[in-house]
């Protein structure tokens, strides 16, 4: 399945942009392959990273729906998933576990509400479950633990700059 996104987003990341998933690789050699249907995720962590990137880049609602297990997928439209109400700042993989056709990924995603740029950076800490059927990994569901909380202004910034949050993204 070919997934298209806003061409300006793609153009900005295609050649030299670092992938938002935190792998350190260039987007075209990382999650873009999955987003455009050139490859499929081979493990739960790879799928988790590609889904995070889809949320961060926006315009990839179809990809998010296609990688969500049909039995747990809510009645959302691709357009609803394309709404960018958060600025995604970073992804931290806490733990992964894969056994046969099941897997879990515990992660922390750092974000700030777009409508309130002065808001504190928030952390979404989730344990996501994945299932592989027919060689295709899909997101099942996730448990948020604990509920999203603000990041201290004195903590290292989630963007990875090495600066304190108050001197970087929370400035």
Range-by-range predicted roles:
Residues 33-76, 81:
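Core segments of small alpha/beta cavity-forming domains
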Residues 13-17, 35-41, 149:
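Glycine/tyrosine- and acidic-biased, solvent-exposed loop/turn segments at the edges of beta-strands
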Residues 123-150:
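Short beta-strand edge/turn micro-motifs at domain boundaries
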Residues 2-14, 145-152:
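Short, flexible, mixed-charge glycine/proline-rich loop motifs
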Residues 14-25, 153-163:
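Short Cys/His-rich zinc-binding micro-motifs
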Residues 84-123:
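Surface-exposed, charged secondary-structure patches
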Residues 29-31, 166-169:
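Cysteine-centered loop/knuckle micro-motif
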Residues 18, 95, 127-129, 156:
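Short, surface-exposed charged micro-motifs
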